[in-house]
Design a protein with these regions (language model features):
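Membrane helical hairpin/interfacial module
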Residues: 55-119
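Membrane-embedded alpha-helical bundles of multi-pass integral membrane proteins
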Residues: 55-59, 125-132
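N-terminal signal-anchor module of multipass membrane proteins
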Residues: 1-73
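Juxtamembrane membrane-interface segments at transmembrane alpha-helix termini
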Residues: 105-108, 134-138
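Alpha-helical transmembrane segments and their immediate interhelical/interface regions
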Residues: 51-75, 109, 168-169, 235-255
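Helix-boundary and loop/linker segments of multi-pass membrane transporters
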Residues: 49-54, 95-96, 226, 267-271
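Transmembrane alpha-helix boundary signature
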Residues: 111-124, 153-157
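Long, contiguous internal "core" modules enriched in hydrophobic/ aromatic residues
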Residues: 11-14, 20-38, 86-88, 126, ...
Length: 281
């Protein structure tokens, strides 16, 4: 087997093993249980969550803060490593991009779940108050999702084209799917130049967007009269806290994927050492 075929076998799409199928079944059961609980909340009201004055948002806001922090750090790490052209980033940077996108999508879903009347979500735009951090939260999260998606997709184009060509003779259906998402990528100089400029621009954009995202979330807390929350230092506090929690979550995800997919040849101890130094920094 050539190195190319071995590489495709290692990192290309694979069928679920028995353990993978059991894990997917478990996750589907969790989703079904969550949907049932959410329907109960819609019918009975948020009283079923047992949230009161002293437990204002409960698990919802905890999940929201965690997902935003992890997404922020994943995006910042990707952007900084791409802008500095650090070569050691290559084996795991795609994982960081996926984590960043998945977490910010989950943060948006958490907001919808937390709303007592999601059918009135349009009122957030119709009757928006620009002095409210909630309004800016509604604006910044979709923006961050779009930029994160593009920052994942544009560098992915050559990989999709490789899989398109690889399966062209063995699996026409997969080849067509990858060909559709590869968007006629042919490695021309024009395409490579445009891709490089686009990724560079997106990396520059996502850093201030991430800082704004974390700052706005901090203002959701600091603009209240609750003792200990009414403080102007919440934004830097949230950003520093996000760096700790987010990098920790990112390292955990990389380790789990590395071990589960047997990618020790690609993600080595050297990369964890680098991520540890980044964590300390």
């Amino acid at each position: 087997m050539s190195k190319y075929d071995q590489f495709i076998k290692d990192v290309g799409p694979q069928k679920f093993s028995r353990g993978g199928m059991l894990w997917m079944g478990f996750l589907i059961l969790l989703i079904v249980a969550g949907v049932v609980a959410y329907i109960d909340q819609l019918i009975e009201g948020q009283v079923v969550t047992n949230m009161r004055d002293y437990v204002l948002w409960g698990v919802y806001i905890s999940n929201f803060v965690f997902f935003v922090a992890t997404s922020f750090v994943g995006a910042i790490v990707v952007a900084v490593l791409r802008l500095t052209k650090s070569e050691w980033r290559r084996p795991f940077v795609r994982l960081a991009e996926i984590v960043a996108l998945a977490c910010i999508i989950m943060a948006g879903i958490t907001i919808v779940i937390d709303m007592a009347r999601p059918d009135r979500m349009l009122n957030l735009f119709i009757h928006a108050r620009l002095q409210s951090p909630i309004t800016w939260d509604v604006i910044i999260i979709p923006t961050f999702i779009v930029v994160s998606l593009l920052l994942l997709y544009f560098p992915l184009l050559p990989d999709l084209a490789i899989l398109r060509d690889h399966y062209s003779g063995t699996n026409k259906r997969l080849s067509k799917i990858y060909g559709f998402f590869a968007a006629k990528w042919q490695w021309t100089q024009k395409q490579l130049k445009l891709q490089k400029k686009s990724v560079h621009l997106l990396a520059l954009m996502i850093i201030p967007l991430g800082l704004i995202l974390e700052s706005i979330d901090a203002y959701l807390f600091s603009t209240t009269y609750r003792v200990g929350w009414d403080s102007s230092n919440f934004a830097p506090y949230f950003i520093s806290g996000a760096m700790v929690a987010g990098i920790g979550a990112l390292v955990s995800v990389v380790y789990i994927v590395r071990r589960n997919k047997q990618l020790e040849a690609y993600i080595t101890e050297y990369h964890f050492d680098k991520m540890g130094k980044l964590f300390n920094l």
